Amino acid sequence: MPLVIFVDDSETALASTRMVTNSMPIEVKQYTEAQVALAEIKAGMIPDLIITDLNMPVMNGLEFLQALRNNPSTNRTPTLMLTTETKPELKEQGKALGLTGWIVKPFNPAQLKQAITRVLRL
């Protein structure tokens, strides 16, 4: 089963993503801190898809994405940004770092499910 990790400092957002993914043929791990997810990745966890929030304390989504791109095991891992931000300059920064897609919160559950299905080719 493909492994999808969600990183968001909001427990509410994580609960919403859990509801969307419960019926999908994927394994899901959730983290409230990007640096914790990054530590697990560096310890050997290899996700098939990473979905992260942008605005988080300590390490934001773009910093997390940069760290993922600097890691040989995740430098090509598809990554989606799930955020309330809509600023074009932030989207451009993400695109420059190899971001796969941008989903705006509050998200439509079908949109998130479709994005996961498309990226993982389920």
Language-model-derived ranges and their functions:
Residues 11-29, 97:
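Two-component/phosphorelay signaling modules centered on CheY-like receiver
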Residues 56:
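Receiver (REC) domain active-site loop signature in two-component systems and cognate sites
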Residues 107-116:
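C-terminal output helix
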Residues 53, 83:
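Active-site residues of response regulator receiver
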Residues 30-49, 92:
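Acidic, metal-coordinating helix/loop segments flanking the phosphotransfer/catalytic sites
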Residues 45-48, 73-78:
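His-Asp phosphorelay/catalytic-motif detector in bacterial-type signaling
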